[in-house]
């Protein structure tokens, strides 16, 4: 059982609490879905349950959080880890090994499990989490979605009674989300207590026993699963929530437009392994071009080639009909990465928005206001929530002055309202004549943005 007794939490350096007077109880075997707008306190709840904030968060906690009758603040983390398994929004932040098999078994090795026990746990994790083909691989050569599945397998292998998952679907394709749904169903069937913080709701809403809706750090309402699924469309949108049903990806269509970016016969490899070959497509100026595909298809590798961060083995990239070398690509292109933590360098949100840009302070503040970030202008970028960091990186791209903007999963961690704002902003950038390329699994975002899906699927791909 998990209890929150009038819990208020304020992060270090902040004056406004992230969580305010929050009280609830979760019984054994329940699957609870926490949802609400970006920054509403979902991740804070997750980190209070697994003890990360009480044991090193540096903030101020009022009230009490207990798991199985034990006060989390007074229980050592190593003991909590045997009861609570965690899967974070950014799985890289919880990895300790270079290889996938070692990562799945790391917790068991750390507590001195026998070889027989580890073999059984590895086989079970491979079956339940679908990571068999990913074992014995370099963990940093995996796609974002593949890393998320390894994180799920690592938590499963430890056999905890409570599982907390923070935006676990944020980097997954449709098939990966269905696999995640199966994992949640199996956890629930096994009698585990499961708590999921999510914006993407369609895959988990019907599995939830209850849905906790947060707004501005307060637990505003608790719905039964049936009540939540019955919410009218307008009510759901007014709450800032994403679709309760899956929105399929649009079919790809080759573009007949000229100008902008043209890719012909591109081939690339990563770590000595061929990723794809003979990739060709066009991304005209003045429209949003979407690159879709399953996890591990090489979409992020393609983005790195397009902006000159990675060298292709064969093929050509043209801009306005002229050959575009790697140096020129780096001059013209700006990449908003899938893991935005890798590109936030400023010591404040405002400083980050102006870094590498000619924007004035007023222009930067206006861009931050557009992305609902101006209130955090003096905060450190890494103190923001996942969705807020994502929006800040988008501000960086918009102020960069570059002609080719490449967004790798720009709606990861975004609620409905901010997803609409990003859609509107990208449409505006396209209207200005920029070339906008978006890598995404988000069908709802593609529908709202009016993006044209490129027919880029490689003729051959080697796993």
Residue ranges and their predicted role:
Residues 155-156, 398:
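ABC ATPase C-loop
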Residues 152-153, 394:
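Hydrophobic anchor residue at the start of the ABC signature
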Residues 163-166, 405-408:
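Catalytic Walker B motif of ABC-type/P-loop ATPase nucleotide-binding domains
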Residues 198-199, 440-441:
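H-loop/switch region of ABC-family ATPase nucleotide-binding domains
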Residues 138-142, 146, 380-384, 388:
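Conserved ABC ATPase signature
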Residues 50, 307:
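Helix-to-loop junction immediately C-terminal to a conserved catalytic motif
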Residues 58-70, 315-329:
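Conserved ABC transporter NBD signature motif
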Residues 116-134, 361-376:
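Conserved ABC ATPase "signature" region
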